Amino acid sequence: MALLQISEPGLTAAPHQRRLAAGIDLGTTNSLVATVRSGKAQTLADEQLADEQLIADEQLIAGEQLIAGQQLIAGQQLINEKQRDLLPSVVHYHPQGIDVGWKARNLAALDPVNTISSVKRMMGRSLADIVQRYPNLPYQFHASENGLPMIQTARGLVNPVQVSAEILKTLAQRAQAALAGELDGVVITVPAYFDDAQRQGTKDAARLAGLHVLRLLNEPTAAAIAYGLDSGQEGVIAVYDLGGGTFDISILRLSRGVFEVLATGGDSALGGDDFDHLLADWLREQAGVATRDDHGIQRQLLDTAIAAKIALSEAETAVVSVAGWQGEVTREQLESLIAPQVKRTLMACRRALKDAGVTADEILEVVMVGGSTRVPLVREQVGQFFGRTPLTSIDPDKVVAIGAAIQADILVGNKPDSDMLLLDVIPLSLGLETMGGLVEKVIPRNTTIPAARAQEFTTFKDGQSAMMIHVLQGERELVKDCRSLARFTLRGLPPLPAGGAHIRVTFQVDADGLLSVTAMEKSTGVEASIQVKPSYGLSDDEIANMIKDSMANAQSDITARKLAEQRVDAARVLESLQGALAEDAALLSEQESAAIAQAVALLQQQMQGSDPQAIEAAIKALDAQTQDFAARRMDASIRRALAGHSVDEV
């Protein structure tokens, strides 16, 4: 007979059937790993860290200190419970091995060339893009054959994917030690505006770390999971995510367990790191030291700035000492330095609200995510902008990892996913080029993903045997104003008259935001496809500018589109007429031929102009002149078809 199974409340009655999953917040400054235990999501600490300090005193920078109020914070990094959960996203390479986390972070001042931090900013970008965006990085870069960055270290060349893999590997080891088993899968969070290349790079890093990726999850969506499930809210909320290296604002509607992202915005090159660098530059000026070529001192200044920023979240003043100089910095001075950056985040919030079609008054709650939201000025300004006190009940450093852990627990099969539905969105419209340099949008902006759309297109010329598929991203009407994503060619089309072949083009965007495009000719089944992986990323500022430009140029774009469409129609009419005249010009009298030639000349003249209505009128005039010719051609075609056949046979 069956045995009665008894379990503790909150625990599964069949623990051997429970699969192990984790959520990973792969951050620019810090990373975390979380899991669901006894029905509750919690971040996992590194139990192997010493209680007193992270690394031996001889590895510290002698004499550097910061005084906040009466508290002395020495060069060593003291550990508290929160720091146990955080893993600095820093990797140090040395001849004997690789260090990740706190030890690597503290070695950055001693060996900056071999200590790689904020690698997330390099993910999916070309070397040229990285050098342009971040000209002061201390690393020795080399370009791979395809232009991607390679970093020279004491252990040889490494790329951003390999560096990220070391961070993921360390987090996975922490999770497996805590759970006493191998992970069945992980959910990794990424910024909402990571493009295809950046998302694919994250997946590749996870694969290199030996992890099975259940899903990539947008960071703001992960935060919504953490808060939405815990508090059961319904309505429109804003997720303000200001981390170390990226800023994201998302407007979400929560309704009966459905998480729908109404709009997103932000800046992939703005975060707490920028606050730190601004304060470090200020300290450098105050100390009167030249550090541009001394990466060690620059790192010391940066560490001091970070400690001062943290101290000023609690105290009004902090006394700092660096490079033989000692002085005081106040919260007011820090706020004056970072005020422009905070203002930039609020401008992005305003754009996101407009995109979502809601006002600040309609926002029920504002969720704060990211360690930089602890800065008092940030909380104050965000509260004033939305007219309500932001939510901070879940640790802003941990909320994303907690949301990822909840989603991982669902995807791995430990609980039914009917509790929750996630609807992320596409930030910019996706489409392809048509004749005349026009853009045909296939999937519009803010469409929820995963998504699939298909449209049919046809050939322009008689006997056309191939078609170039040009995939585009953007909101404008003309190809020249949009971003090119990829090109591929569909060959082997049947040699039919213009318009005879029918090509079905399908766009598919998966849950991770990766785009696949397939083109198939319906009668033959011949097809070609491509997976879009841009060689470098698209910043949030560029996305915002593309949307802004589309609004500012809406009227002129419509006019330009009408003009291009009329020119394409005119070209199609002229090409068709040219073929007809080549076959049946004998059906026309000299007077008729002259009238048609005159109408053709007028149409060609109007095509050179910029008046779409004039082109349309010229097309109609030519059509009127050729109606009798078309009727005669039809009669002649019928006579040829019936030649040699009796009435009975017909």
UniProtKB/Swiss-Prot annotation:
> What segment(s) does the record annotate as region Insert?
49-82
Xref: PROSITE patterns: HSP70_1, HSP70_2, HSP70_3
- The entry's keywords: ATP-binding, Chaperone, Nucleotide-binding, Repeat
* Organism superkingdom: Bacteria
Q: Name one GO biological process term.
A: iron-sulfur cluster assembly
Known InterPro entries for this protein? ATPase_NBD, Heat_shock_70_CS, HscA_NBD, HSP70_C_sf, HSP70_peptide-bd_sf, Hsp_70_fam, ISC_FeS_clus_asmbl_HscA
A GO MF label: ATP hydrolysis activity
Provide the Gene Ontology terms for cellular component.
cytosol
Write down a Pfam family by its short name. HSP70
Positions annotated as sequence repeat: 46-50, 51-56, 57-62, 63-68, 69-74, 75-79
What is the documented function of this protein? Chaperone involved in the maturation of iron-sulfur cluster-containing proteins. Has a low intrinsic ATPase activity which is markedly stimulated by HscB. Involved in the maturation of IscU.
HAMAP family in alphabetical order: HscA
Q: Which family does it belong to?
A: Belongs to the heat shock protein 70 family.
What is this protein's record name? Chaperone protein HscA
Native organism is Yersinia pestis
Please name the gene that encodes this protein: hscA
